[in-house]
Amino acid sequence: MKRAILIDGNNLLFRSYYATAYSGNLMKNSKDFPTNALFGFVNMINKIMNEEKPEYVVVAFDKGKNFRHEEYAEYKAGRIETPKDLLKQFPIAYDILDAMGIVSLGVDNYEADDIIGTFARMADEDDMYDATIVSSDKDLLQLISHDVNVKLLKQKDYILMNEQVFFDTYGLKPIRMIDLKALMGDASDNIPGVKGIGEKTALNLLHEYDTIENLYDNIDSVKGKTKDKLIEGKESAYFSKKIATIYKEVPVNMSFNDIKLKDRNLTKLKNIYKDLEFFS
């Protein structure tokens, strides 16, 4: 079995930036260029490569607004603007990955999640490959399958989420994560869900009905105020499910052979680290 690692690049850079930004330790080199996100990013990439030893790697990035914003202008509207000191570090991250022999990829009108979803789908369809997704974003848990698992990053470690661990945690199949979001919403992405339905109620409903489609087909068997909330929020539930669903057909025009790990360009890498003043 050939192993592919699918890394959420935006997630890693944001995590690395805010890990020190909150404490006021932005880290800058002598030219006053911010380096804190890059420092954590490099350490994380090296850790992933050492632990996983993959043959195939892609680091996916967002590329501006995507098709979800066209359908729902308020998508992720509650998030603060990306700090300029973080934005400056993205191009250097791409250069570092290139020097490491790792493919970085962003596609117009799609999110990093969609790129990862596309490669996850490719792993599902090809018996020669399995894939591990690396991110702290629970949205990606919907991609878990027999051939795909998720290293769900925590503050100091991670949880390896596979089909069994997901079921033990939620009592559902991983794909039902989109139905869970359809009902309870997601404040971080500004996905509305059904007003008044929280995680506990949503899980109980899905344990009984499995999908929102089956739930609404059997809405008369739901009792009390929950039924009223569901009826009132039906349109929002279906819309939320659509927005929460990761798209798996991004036109990447690539196969796994195109993300095969290449030899590191040690000279280029050394020069980048020297410029950033990474000496350890």
Question: Where would I find each of the regions flagged by the language model?
Answer:
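Noncatalytic, basic helical substrate-engagement surface that gates or grips nucleic-acid strands
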Residues: 1-131, 138-160, 237-239, 245-253, ...
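Non-catalytic nucleic-acid-binding/docking modules located in mid-to-C-terminal regions
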Residues: 54-58, 102, 125-128, 146-149, ...
